[in-house]
Every structure is written in structure tokens, then in C-alpha cells.
Amino acid sequence: MEFIDVIKSRKSIRSFINKEIDQDKLEYICNCARLAPSWMNKQCWHFIVIKNSEKINAIAKASIINRWLKKVPVIIVACADPLSSGKKNGIDYSNVDVAIAFENMILASTDIGLGTCWIGGFDHDKVKKILEIPPRIKIIAMTPLGYPMNKENIIEKSKKIIIRNTKRRSLREIIHNDIW
């Protein structure tokens, strides 16, 4: 797939078929995250790949809006170690660094036919406890990972009703040359 096609075809998937993901695909996705650039090459990221159904269920129960996660085959939690990142002028670069690596992971997943969904809305403290994440580590985001279900279920239909606009703004609206 051409890179632009990967970007265009990436969408938030919330329904997956019950099929295990091969370890080589998981390693490919994780390696794509590992190769991301970071501030001063600090590589402050850590990723927790969760396949254990009890852990997945616990994460799903941690927030009412994420109950749908209980049926996903894998969840990946993207974390940052702020002490392993850089700060300059009071700006902590760990969030940006992890987001770059996580997007590499999301796009790599799309490229090999797997679905994802960036999730930032969840109870971070509960998830940290479930996954035994050390106190200094921040959770940046998480995503389910799996083979997308072809049929549109009630969650997808509801999403289309709630989020009506999927049109992207034109380049003319977002690009400024030389000045604002």
C-alpha cells in the first residue's frame, strides 16, 4: 500500500473478529514504534501489549465508555517515562515523543490490515493499577488491536450519528506561507 493510502484508510475501529494476531505482526508493529524519532533520541516510550483476557476485561470495566473493549483480542497501552525524556523551557517532550511512536504503530497496523482506535478517555489511575505501572510513568493513550469486523455494528452506527463530520479541511484552510 502507498503511504498516502495507509493514512487515508486509517480509521477508528471498535469491532473486531475473534482472531488471534500473529506474533510476527505484533513485533512488526512494535518495531515501527521503536524506530520513531524523539527529542534528543531519548526514546522515553514503553508499550504494554495485553493479550490476557482478564486484564482486557479489567481495563474495559475501568471506564463505562470503554466497555466495548472487553471483546478485543489485544490492547496496547502507550506510556512515557518523563525522567527519560527531555525538558526545555518548561516543556516536557515525553507526550509528543510517545505520540509520534504510537502513531507509527497505528499506521503500521493499518498497513498490515489490522484495526486500531486511539483512546485517551479512560481512568488512568485504574489502568495503571491493573497493569502495575510504576508511579512516575504516564499513560499517554491506548488502542485495541485486531482484525476489523466487516459488518457495521451498533457502536459504529452510533458513532456516525454522534460524529457526523468526517470531512478533512483543505490545505488552503490549514497551511500558511511565510506568515499567518
Where are the regions a protein language model picked out?
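Acidic, surface-exposed loops and disordered segments
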Residues: M1-W180
